[in-house]
Amino acid sequence: MNSKIFAVLLLLALLSCVLSDQYCPKSSITACKKMNIRNDCCKDDDCTGGSWCCATPCGNFCKYPTDRPGGRRAAGGKSCKTGYVY
């Protein structure tokens, strides 16, 4: 009996992990002029309200995660600066 309960709980835990995958949304923009590239964030801590720092061709922006893959999170790092990137 205990092993059946354990198996059900384990299955529920695995399903919740699989179903909770979150991604940065895919950008609809494929290119951006260099003078328009701007970073609003460099890491997730720069964003508020549960949004993530996501990379786009026009810079890094805070976006709410989605369940569809395609976008990418900003790499951040010491060289990342907020504001316009020239």
Curated annotation (Swiss-Prot):
It comes from the Eukaryota. Keywords: Antibiotic, Antimicrobial, Disulfide bond, Secreted, Signal, Toxin. It is found in: Secreted. Coiled coil: none annotated. GO terms for cellular component: extracellular region. Residues 1-20 form the signal peptide. Contains 5 disulfide bonds. InterPro entries: Elafin-like_sf. GO terms for biological process: defense response to bacterium. Disulfide bonds join 24-54, 32-58, 41-53, 42-80, 47-62. Has antibacterial activity. This is U15-lycotoxin-Ls1e.
